[in-house]
């Protein structure tokens, strides 16, 4: 066992003395058992994590029963909703790397034999997964579970996105501040990750397809007693995984990544999942090119539409309809789409895991013969405005915006754009451009939920597009094109745009372009002043120096690597 490094032999007496002082060692016999880290992310700032202390307690109890010795430790976490719309959002994506590094540090420093990872919200799940693949010791994931959707006193189903959009409605006088407060007080009724197919729930659902979590991980509500049982089962299973030396890189392979992307496209997951899955592939040392995604999307039917794509279906409805296993079972009917031989932490293949699944509500999970669209709910666009690609959640775009040409309204920050939208500077037909908000430029590639919600709330969602080198919340809807690469701070073409330039978005043909000759674009870029970092001290300053482009997952490379590029 790895942990023998810190517990076996007479020379390790000081180590054993310290371990006994933790209170986790019941007797000397425990030094003959595997040491299992309970990698929790409990904190009282994130509603999706406020209940995880109890799940950690359950996990420790079950690991001990199964023959392991549990040691709980915590990672940091950021609530994207609370961090939205101010400098805090610049820390959100950057926190993913801190989480990965911190999990690596604890597991390696203390020579843990395995990990039960208990994440839930946006950057915590991928951060822990990146660490799991980096250190490659047996790991199982069990998330905290989704929040139940809210309900107003009048019976209207609402969620966090309802509140963001209500802010826009309030700004136009469509609703009163009192009505806004009612929505505010109804939308988030308790603990759990926000209730739609936003980033947190998307990643926790993908964990099932990747094979690193048990069936049910993505959809069983946080408040459902079955969530505690799932934690118990996962915590027993980790001891088996350690005893059989089954590691993350045995499970997360190229074929399981393709399975996860297929699920993502079938349920119209958050655009952030592409960013995170590319980063996960990097940690697994798997070559996966951004450009491959359109070919996979082309053969993946979009069969499960969940908020924000439709406001009357939430994760609890997906669970009731059969969960992720039912979606995967339906997708398995598409010839050659899924690799059902992919191994999973259950000890069975993906195909064996979903064999007994069935769709219980065709209004929630459609058949492959009757999809919302024949192609997936996410796409990568290319063109002279995004030569390295840009990402859009096609499943949340209204039909009239699938193709659109309009004049650019250019803003060099999210704050400027929000002010412009709220001041009424945006008209039907416009293409809002928010730049210098990419991984380096932001820094931290902040989410644009506030401006997209303001556009929706002001009734412009069917006539205005938004393009950015930043990213979007999983809750954004409309013609929202993000991850434009190269970013403005790297002198990508988006930096050359000026007000009035005509931009064409052609989603069916996966194209985004500006009506300018290449010579004009090149000339404007050549005239740009060198980018001046917005933040020059602390973690974000270091992050901005080391982070790579969105089309590679916005991962961090060491300075020598960056200089060689």
Curated annotation (Swiss-Prot):
Modified residues (N6-carboxylysine): 123
Manner of cofactor binding, per the entry note: Binds 1 [2Fe-2S] cluster per subunit. This cluster acts as a Lewis acid cofactor.
Keywords attached to this entry: 2Fe-2S, Amino-acid biosynthesis, Branched-chain amino acid biosynthesis, Iron, Iron-sulfur, Lyase, Magnesium, Metal-binding
Reaction catalysed by this enzyme: (2R)-2,3-dihydroxy-3-methylbutanoate = 3-methyl-2-oxobutanoate + H2O; (2R,3R)-2,3-dihydroxy-3-methylpentanoate = (S)-3-methyl-2-oxopentanoate + H2O
Enzyme class: lyase
SUPFAM superfamilies recorded: IlvD/EDD N-terminal domain-like, LeuD/IlvD-like
Gene Ontology cellular-component terms listed: cytosol
Keyword flag Secreted: no
Necessary cofactors: [2Fe-2S] cluster; Mg(2+)
Location of the active site: 473 (proton acceptor)
Enzyme Commission number, as recorded: 4.2.1.9
GO biological process: isoleucine biosynthetic process; L-valine biosynthetic process
Pathway: Amino-acid biosynthesis; L-isoleucine biosynthesis; L-isoleucine from 2-oxobutanoate: step 3/4; Amino-acid biosynthesis; L-valine biosynthesis; L-valine from pyruvate: step 3/4
Pfam families: ILV_EDD_C (PF24877), ILVD_EDD_N (PF00920)
Superkingdom per UniProt: Bacteria
GO molecular function, one term: 2 iron, 2 sulfur cluster binding
Binding-site residues for [2Fe-2S] cluster, renumbered to this chain: 121, 194
Alphabetical list of InterPro entries matching this protein: Dihydro-acid_dehy_C (IPR042096), DihydroxyA_deHydtase (IPR004404), DiOHA_6PGluconate_deHydtase_CS (IPR020558), ILV_EDD_C (IPR056740), ILV_EDD_N (IPR000581), IlvD/EDD_N (IPR037237)
Keyword hit for Iron: yes
Binding site for Mg(2+): 80, 122-123, 447
Functional note: Functions in the biosynthesis of branched-chain amino acids. Catalyzes the dehydration of (2R,3R)-2,3-dihydroxy-3-methylpentanoate (2,3-dihydroxy-3-methylvalerate) into 2-oxo-3-methylpentanoate (2-oxo-3-methylvalerate) and of (2R)-2,3-dihydroxy-3-methylbutanoate (2,3-dihydroxyisovalerate) into 2-oxo-3-methylbutanoate (2-oxoisovalerate), the penultimate precursor to L-isoleucine and L-valine, respectively.
Record note on quaternary structure: Homodimer.
Family, as annotated: Belongs to the IlvD/Edd family.
NCBIfam families in alphabetical order: ilvD, PRK00911.1
HAMAP family assigned: IlvD (MF_00012)
Protein name stated in the entry: Dihydroxy-acid dehydratase
Gene source species: Chlorobium limicola (strain DSM 245 / NBRC 103803 / 6330)
């Amino acid at each position: 066992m790895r942990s023998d490094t810190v517990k076996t032999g007479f020379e390790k007496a000081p180590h054993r003395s310290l371990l006994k002082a933790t209170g986790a060692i019941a007797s000397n016999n425990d030094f003959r058992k595997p040491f299992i880290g309970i990698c929790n992310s409990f904190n009282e700032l994130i509603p999706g994590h406020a209940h995880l202390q109890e799940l950690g307690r359950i996990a420790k109890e079950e690991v001990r029963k199964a023959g392991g010795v549990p040691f709980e430790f915590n990672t940091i976490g950021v609530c994207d909703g609370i961090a939205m719309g101010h400098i805090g959002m610049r820390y959100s994506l950057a926190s993913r790397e801190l989480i990965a590094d911190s999990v690596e540090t604890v597991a390696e420093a203390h020579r843990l034999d395995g990990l039960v990872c208990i994440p839930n919200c946006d950057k915590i799940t991928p951060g822990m997964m990146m660490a799991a693949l980096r250190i490659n010791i047996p790991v199982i994931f069990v998330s905290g579970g989704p929040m139940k959707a809210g309900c107003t006193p009048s019976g209207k189903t609402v969620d966090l996105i309802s509140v963001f959009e209500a802010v826009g409605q309030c700004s136009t006088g469509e609703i009163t501040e009192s009505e806004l407060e009612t929505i505010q007080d109804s939308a988030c009724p308790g603990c759990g990750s926000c209730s739609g197919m936003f980033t947190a729930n998307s990643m926790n659902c993908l964990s099932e397809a990747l094979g690193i979590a048990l069936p049910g991980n993505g959809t069983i509500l946080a408040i459902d007693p079955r969530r505690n049982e799932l934690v118990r089962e996962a915590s027993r299973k980790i001891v088996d995984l350690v005893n059989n030396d089954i590691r993350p890189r045995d499970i997360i392979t190229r074929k399981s990544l393709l399975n996860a992307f297929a699920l993502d496209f079938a349920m119209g997951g958050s655009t952030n999942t592409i960013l995170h899955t590319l980063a996960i592939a990097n940690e697994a040392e798997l070559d996966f090119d951004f450009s491959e995604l359109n070919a996979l999307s082309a053969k993946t039917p979009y069969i499960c539409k969940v908020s924000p794509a439709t406001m009357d279906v939430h994760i609890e409805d997906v669970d009731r309809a059969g969960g992720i296993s039912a979606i995967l079972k339906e997708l398995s009917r598409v010839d050659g789409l899924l690799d059902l031989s992919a191994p999973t932490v259950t000890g069975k293949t993906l195909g064996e895991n979903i064999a007994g699944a069935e769709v219980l509500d065709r209004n929630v999970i459609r058949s492959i013969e009757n999809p919302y669209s024949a192609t997936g709910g996410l796409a990568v666009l290319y063109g002279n405005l995004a030569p390295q690609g840009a990402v859009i959640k096609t499943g949340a775009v209204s039909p009239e915006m699938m193709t659109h040409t309009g004049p650019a309204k250019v803003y060099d920050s999210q704050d400027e754009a929000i002010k412009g939208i709220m001041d009424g500077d945006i008209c039907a037909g416009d293409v809002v451009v928010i730049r210098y908000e990419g991984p380096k430029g932001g820094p931290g590639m902040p989410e644009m939920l506030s401006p997209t919600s303001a556009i929706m709330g002001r009734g412009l969602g069917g006539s205005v597009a938004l393009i950015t080198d930043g990213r979007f919340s999983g809750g954004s809807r409309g013609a929202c094109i993000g991850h434009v690469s190269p970013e403005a701070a790297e002198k990508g073409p988006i930096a050359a745009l000026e007000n009035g330039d005509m931009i064409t978005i052609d989603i069916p043909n996966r194209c985004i372009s500006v009506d300018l000759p290449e010579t004009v674009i090149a000339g404007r870029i050549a005239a740009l002043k060198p980018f001046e970092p917005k933040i020059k001290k602390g973690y974000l300053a270091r992050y901005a120096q080391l982070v790579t482009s969105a089309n590679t997952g916005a991962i961090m490379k060491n300075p020598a690597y960056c200089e060689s590029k």
